């Protein structure tokens, strides 16, 4: 957020450029029409996935391309890149995707803090970490399952009940539990 950027900039001083990605910058395609042309969307069968033959395809949504371009321009000239996102799976995914999309040379420094105070930011800057790939893979597994199940099941559910109905990995079992409880 602009307020966080301003506060962190003030703490770090003029030697640092602080910018925000404003959240996620890459995602799985929303539908097969969103799959980049270098991939054959006819070969991607979201419902028939076997271990070992599935590869996630990430795209930069149109509304994120400008910010990615701006961040890449800064990262290309920076002697070091620090990635400060939330210390959870979503934050790790944002950091991972920033590293990939910005084509950061070398390993970016991953910093984490739970409050934006001078002591917390300084401590994080003095003790950088690396991107936790395990935490990213955890995010990726959840996101992939959500998308695969949603792609397959939501259109069928909409056919039964209306344009704005969807279901997924969590919704389906949760609804089942509610139905069983009510019976």
Positions of PLM-derived features:
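Intrinsically disordered, low-complexity regulatory segments
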Residues: 2-140
């Amino acid at each position: 957020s602009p307020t966080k950027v301003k506060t962190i900039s003030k703490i770090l001083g003029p030697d640092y450029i602080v910018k925000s990605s404003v959240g996620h910058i890459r995602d799985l395609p929303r539908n097969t029409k969103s799959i980049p042309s270098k991939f054959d969307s006819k070969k991607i069968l979201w419902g028939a996935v076997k271990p070992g033959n599935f590869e996630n395809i990430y795209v930069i949504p149109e509304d994120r391309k400008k910010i990615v371009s701006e961040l890449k321009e800064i990262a290309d000239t920076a002697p070091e890149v620090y990635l400060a996102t939330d210390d959870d799976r979503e934050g790790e995914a944002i950091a991972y995707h920033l590293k990939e999309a910005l084509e950061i040379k070398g390993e970016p420094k991953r910093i984490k803090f739970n409050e934006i105070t001078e002591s917390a930011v300084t401590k994080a800057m003095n003790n950088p970490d690396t991107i936790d790939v395990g935490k990213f893979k955890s995010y990726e597994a959840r996101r992939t399952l959500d998308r695969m199940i949603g792609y397959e099941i939501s259109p069928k559910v909409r056919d039964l009940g209306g344009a704005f109905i969807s279901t997924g990995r969590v919704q389906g079992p949760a609804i089942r539990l509610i139905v069983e409880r009510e019976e």
